[in-house]
Regions:
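Flexible, active-site-adjacent loop/turn segments at secondary-structure boundaries
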Residues: 1-3, 11, 48, 56-59, ...
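Arg/Lys-rich, positively charged N-terminal/basic patches that mediate binding to nucleic acids
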Residues: 1-38
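Short, surface-exposed helix-loop/turn micro-motifs enriched in polar/charged residues
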Residues: 2, 50-53, 89-92
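Amphipathic alpha-helical interface surfaces
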Residues: 6, 30, 34-37, 57, ...
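Residue-level marker of positions within ordered structural domains that often coincide
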Residues: 15, 46, 86
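Conserved phosphate-interacting/catalytic interface
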Residues: 41
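A short, surface-exposed loop/turn module that caps and links secondary-structure elements
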Residues: 45-69
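Enriched for short, Lys/Arg-rich terminal
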Residues: 68-105
Length: 105
């Protein structure tokens, strides 16, 4: 699956493991897990394949965040993303990563 990043800091975190913007500082364990989950998402052919990993807790969000999906980083953080299906088939899914959010805020 193809991954694009909506925010620059998300791409910086993935590429270099840190960000230049001090507003988005995370613990090293969170960053390592974030990179691991993004790599796992890239390896999968589509978002449906994420359901076989129970620890990710893949779900489509409801309410104010309807239209987004999420996977868990740990109990506190999740990656929120938009799914874009190209063509009639779900062959190529482009995930647009929108946020690394603190789940309970």
């Amino acid at each position: 699956m193809d991954i694009t990043f909506k925010q620059d800091y998300l791409q910086e975190l993935y590429k270099s493991g840190k960000t230049t913007d001090k507003k988005y500082r995370f613990q090293p364990a969170i960053i390592r897990k974030y990179i691991r989950v993004i790599n796992l998402m890239i390896e999968q052919p589509d978002t449906f394949s994420l359901t076989k990993y129970n620890s990710l807790n893949y779900e489509k969000l409801k309410g104010k965040k309807a239209g987004l999906s999420s996977v868990r980083i740990n109990d506190q953080y999740r990656i929120e993303f938009e799914e874009i299906i190209v063509g009639n088939q779900t062959v190529a899914t482009i995930c647009h990563i929108t946020e690394l959010s603190n789940h309970y805020q």
